[in-house]
Amino acid sequence: MVSSLKDMLKYDEGEKLEMYKDTEGNYTIGIGHLITKNKDKNEAIKILEGEIGHTVKLNSKKEPEISSSESESLFEKDKSVAINSIENSSTLSTIYNNLDSNRKMALANMVFQMGASNVSKFKKSLKLIEEKKWAEAAIELKNSTWNTQTPKRSNRVISVFETGTLKEYK
């Protein structure tokens, strides 16, 4: 049962303790933690080692791997960055602060995935969300490139905006 932003993001992002390339080809680990957009694996490992504070262990497949607690630590930092970027956004902060807790999680999920500056470009959708016109906002969000690129995830998030419930997160 999803009851927190962490649960929601873990559902959408998954949690992989082994370094991998995301859909954009970027080195990622943990709960959707972007290590770098640099395509050089050795550079990604160096960055990751700086983030976790020690040499990365290699698993049996000789791939860099972190512990569950390191994944948790990276996630907490990423979550703080996402929430702080919402709070520091002139476009998003007022909208976010006037949402119920489930819809706050939905907006934070979008920011976690795309960044506050990209979410701020959803002008029509954000206006409809601000006006609490949930059905219209859902239609607008469904017509986005975001929905085309990650339809399963975006449809779950859109459902939260539309219904105010977490029923799509089972």
Swiss-Prot record:
Q: Which residues form the active site?
A: E13 (proton donor), D22 (nucleophile)
Question: Could you tell me the EC number(s) of this protein?
Answer: 3.2.1.17
Annotated GO biological process: cell wall macromolecule catabolic process; defense response to bacterium; killing of cells of another organism; peptidoglycan catabolic process
Q: Which UniProt keywords apply?
A: Antimicrobial, Bacteriolytic enzyme, Glycosidase, Hydrolase
Catalysed transformations (reactions) = Hydrolysis of (1->4)-beta-linkages between N-acetylmuramic acid and N-acetyl-D-glucosamine residues in a peptidoglycan and between N-acetyl-D-glucosamine residues in chitodextrins
Question: Per the record's keyword annotation, is Hydrolase included, yes or no?
Answer: yes
Gene3D superfamilies in UniProt? 1.10.530.40
Any one Gene Ontology molecular-function term assigned to this protein's record = lysozyme activity
**Could you confirm whether the keyword Hydrolase appears in this record?**
yes
| InterPro entries hit by this protein | Glyco_hydro_24, Lysozyme-like_dom_sf, Lysozyme_dom_sf, Phage_lysozyme-like, T4-type_lysozyme
UniProt xrefs under PANTHER family: T4-TYPE LYSOZYME 1-RELATED
Q: Which family is this protein grouped under?
A: Belongs to the glycosyl hydrolase 24 family.
Q: What is this protein called?
A: Probable T4-type lysozyme 2
**Originating organism:** Dictyostelium discoideum (Social amoeba)
